Design a protein with these regions (language model features):
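Extracytoplasmic/periplasmic substrate-recognition and gating elements
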Residues: 53, 146-148, 277-341
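Conserved C-terminal helix/tail region of periplasmic/extracytoplasmic solute-binding proteins
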Residues: 146, 170, 367-425
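Extracytoplasmic/periplasmic solute-binding protein
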Residues: 127-131, 136, 162-217, 262
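Glycine-centered hinge/linker elements that transmit conformational signals in sensory
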Residues: 165-166, 211-247
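Conserved N-terminal structural module of periplasmic/extracytoplasmic solute-binding proteins
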Residues: 6-7, 20-92, 108-109, 293-294, ...
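Short helix-initiation/N-cap motifs at beta->coil->alpha
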Residues: 62-71, 158-160, 244-259
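Hinge/lid segment of periplasmic solute-binding proteins
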Residues: 88-139, 143-146, 283-286
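Short, solvent-exposed loop/beta-turn-alpha elements that line the ligand-binding surface or hinge
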Residues: 102-115, 180, 184-187, 202-228, ...
């Protein structure tokens, strides 16, 4: 399929070059296939602003949550393919690196203030660059914690989190709110548990081995799956929604938190703009799960939001796309809109972020807490791997038996080895 796409795009480029005289005055155009649904409204606004300022046409299409790879595959097969897309991890580099322009020495690469989030292919080509720095964990409404007769000081480890969450759930009818918002397992939400929460298994394996991963390991030990179970069980069994109803989705966890129906919301810093208006003192705590010494745990910090430019776009479209990227990170008005939604952007002329959750991440680090790196970015054959985990978790939510949890562990640990072999065999 990808060879066919590459051939089609090459033929389109040859045709464009042959007709170059007809397009001598072409300013080029931009087609941004956006990865983040929460950014869509702002992205559409920015596209309109840029077109009005420059005359360059900018099209923004936002993939539905959990469908980016399918959407990218479909869109790349079209004559008017995206000129700006996302390659967010090493699996993406393997799959889409050949479609990415080498950004080394470009104007957008020169705007970076760090190369920590850059992704390179095996030939050393800079195929994608990070456009925001994020963190994730458990978002908390301190007012509801206090209303339930508890204190944020109790939330320093799994034992404290469990005590508070179970106490709130037991009194949910009386209090008028529950502990956790819904933990839906449909495509719009399951990534919070199969991509993010599962990261605790990977990071604690790294810490046990004494080094962070620099490449995808062939196998996992599974030594921390009981800790993953601790936190997952706490989320689904002390919630507004019965675990048996999570598979089909349809619950709005963000709205549940914003409207004061739940004290805890498993998510990340990208939610700050959405929830802070309703819960201005919302804060974020780590994935406490019962690991020894977790009182010194911090938040999960990193990114999988990395821009790539289509190698097979016309020269005019490539130039227009890079110019648009530079404008997003350097124009004061445009950048302010981006930072409001995304938080920290790693560029020289980007404004400072006021994102409270990123401030929480910094505070944990300054207090000497260890950071959870985004080891989850190494998930092999990510879509297939996560699909297997979703299937097992759905069976477990329907019937929380030991046998069904064993299937979850198989999907997470044996499934990793299976997908690694498929990706590297």
């Amino acid at each position: 399929m990808k060879k066919t796409i590459a051939l089609v795009l090459t033929l389109v480029l040859i045709f464009a070059l042959a007709c170059s005289s007809a397009f001598a005055a072409d300013k080029g155009s931009v087609y941004w296939l956006n990865f983040k649904p929460e950014l869509d409204e702002t992205a559409q606004q920015l596209a309109k602003m840029y077109t009005e300022e420059t005359g360059v046409d900018v099209k923004v299409v936002t993939a539905a949550s959990g469908t980016y790879q399918q959407t990218l595959t479909s869109e790349m097969d079209k004559k008017a393919a995206p000129t700006l897309f996302i390659i967010g991890n090493q699996a993406g580099v393997k799959e889409w690196g050949e479609f990415a322009m080498d950004l080394t020495g470009t104007a957008i690469a020169d705007e970076l203030n760090t190369d920590a989030y850059n992704l390179y292919d095996e030939d050393g080509r800079l195929v994608s660059i990070g456009y925001c720095y994020e963190c994730y964990g458990i978002i908390v409404n301190p007012d509801l914690i206090e209303k339930a007769g508890h204190s944020m000081d109790e939330l320093k480890n799994f034992e404290g989190l469990k005590t508070v969450a179970e106490a709130i759930h037991a009194r949910a009818d009386e209090l008028g709110f529950d502990a956790f918002s819904s933990s839906d397992m449909d495509g719009s939400s399951s990534w919070r548990f199969t991509g993010h929460m599962i990261n605790l298994e990977y990071v604690y394996e790294e810490r046990e081995a004494g080094a962070v991963w620099t490449e995808c390991p062939a196998t996992l030990t599974g030594n921390y799956m009981e800790n993953y179970k601790n936190l997952f069980d706490l989320c689904i069994n002390n919630s507004l929604t019965d675990p048996k109803d999570l598979a089909t989705g349809g619950h709005d966890a963000e709205a549940e938190f914003k409207t004061g129906k739940a004290a805890f919301f498993v998510n990340g810093s990208w939610e700050y703009a959405a929830v802070s208006g309703d819960v201005p003192n919302a804060t974020m705590i780590p994935y406490y799960c019962g690991v020894e010494g977790e009182e010194k745990a911090g938040l999960n910090c990193g990114t999988e939001n990395c821009w790539a430019v289509n190698e097979y776009a016309s020269d005019a479209d490539k130039e227009a796309t890079v110019d648009f990227m530079v404008w997003l990170v350097s124009d004061p008005e445009a950048n302010a809109l981006m930072v409001e939604q995304l938080g920290i952007m790693p560029y020289k002329h980007s404004i400072e972020s006021s994102n409270g959750f990123l401030n929480d991440a910094a505070a944990y680090t300054e207090d000497g807490c260890y950071v959870f790196d985004w080891a989850t970015n190494y998930q092999p054959n990510v879509d297939e791997y996560r699909a297997g985990l979703v299937s097992a978790l759905n069976a477990y939510c329907a019937d929380q038996s030991d046998a069904n949890w064993a299937l979850v562990k198989t999907a997470a640990i044996d499934g990793w080895a299976t997908q690694y072999a498929a990706a590297n065999g």
